[in-house]
Amino acid sequence: DWLRRHRFTSTVIDLRAMPRLLHLKTGLSWLGGRRLLATGDIAGHEALNGWEVVQVPEGEDYAANCIWVNDALLVAEGFPATSALLGELGYDVVPLAMSEFRKMDGGLSCLSVRW
């Protein structure tokens, strides 16, 4: 009801059919505008119809958990194909060391305080 009163909508995405995703941000990030970065697990989901979905390259799923802030895209280092793809799309890609956080399934969105 609150969402509707403030002219927002919501969509349920059932992650039980996607066992490799710990939570939605594990496989999906907003890149600004109507563009999303997604893993193959979720890239074709019907809830994403109407969005431009950029799929992370094979074997680089962890890179899908990124943060777009102040015209820079913070990404985990060590995923060169994803970084190159995002750079080609015009993003200022800033790779960050995440290897220790990754050991405990932590990602960039886990470390951020969002507004």
Where are these predicted regions, by residue range?
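The feature marks the mature, well-folded catalytic cores of soluble enzymes
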Residues: 1-115
